[in-house]
Amino acid sequence: MIFSGLFDRHPKLKIACTEFDAGWLGVIVQQVDYQYGPKKAAHGNTVREDMKLELPPSEYFHRNLWFTFLDDRAAALTTPIFGEDNYMWSSDYPHAACTWPYSQQIVERTCQGIDPAVKRKLCRENVNKLYNLGLEFNCA
């Protein structure tokens, strides 16, 4: 989607990528700009005309793509690299792989040591923002 130019043509489009966890994002986002730019330049390669983007590839991850995770501590620990604005914890209820009835325990284990403000974003504020739910939270 990124290299097709979709997000250049539709900059406000937001896509939620669900049900495959997100601990891998830190590595991908870190590498995608390098693979697209400096590495190609170092080897004398240029970007194909049909793959030229208006922004660095990583910017589309932050602007257009949102990711969910269930029981994925690596995803929570990746927030310093990827950022905390496009991650969302998910229970996957009612599917067989869901975290219910242990969702609260899994969230606590997954987010152990994470700043409480980041945890709030991962567990409720980001989904509220993505879907424009307009919910107000009066709890810590």
List each model region and its residues.
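Histidine/acidic residue-rich metal-binding segments in metalloenzymes
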Residues: M1-E59, R73-D85
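Mid-to-C-terminal alpha-helical segments outside catalytic/metal-binding sites
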Residues: S4-G5, L13, G23-W24, W66, ...
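Aromatic- and acid-rich polysaccharide-binding/catalytic face
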Residues: Y60, N64
